[in-house]
Amino acid sequence: MIKSLFNIRPAEKHPVFLLFSMFFFIVFASITGSAMRDAIFLIHYDKTYLPIMYLFVAITMILIINLYNRSSEGKNQLLLLIITGIIFSITLLAFQFFLSGIAIPLFYVWIEIITIFSVMQFWLVTGDIFNSRQAKRIFPLIIAG
C-alpha cells in the first residue's frame, strides 16, 4: 500500500527503507540526547544559565559549520556522515567517563552539535541519492520516519 501511495519504484524501495529508518533513529537519538543533556545540565547548574548555553551553541555552530563547509567541499557526503558518526560515538563514550565540572556545559553544546550535524548530513546524503522529481514523491515518506 505504501509503495502505491507514494509511487515508490522497485529500485527505490531499499534506499527509502534505509533512509526512513535512519531518520527515525536520528530523531530518536536527538530527542533522547536532548532530554539527557538538559537533565544533566539542570542537575548541576541553575536554569538561569540556559540562555548562555544557547548563545554558546549558536556561536559554536557558526564556527563548526563554516569549518565543515570548507573542509567537506567536493567530498563524498556518505563517507563524511560515517566518519562524523564514528567521531560522535567516540566523543560520547569519552563524555561518560569525564562528565563533571566544565565537561557538563561542553556536553550540552556537543549534544546540540551532534543533533544539528546529524540532521544536516542526513539531508545532504538524501539529496545526493534522489533527484528533485523523486524527492517530491519520496521525502514525505522519509520525513515520517
Regions found by a protein language model. Give the residues of each.
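Intracellular juxtamembrane helix-capping segments at the cytosolic ends
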Residues: 36-37, 115-131
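Loop-to-transmembrane helix entry/capping segments in MFS-fold secondary transporters
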Residues: 47-48, 132-142
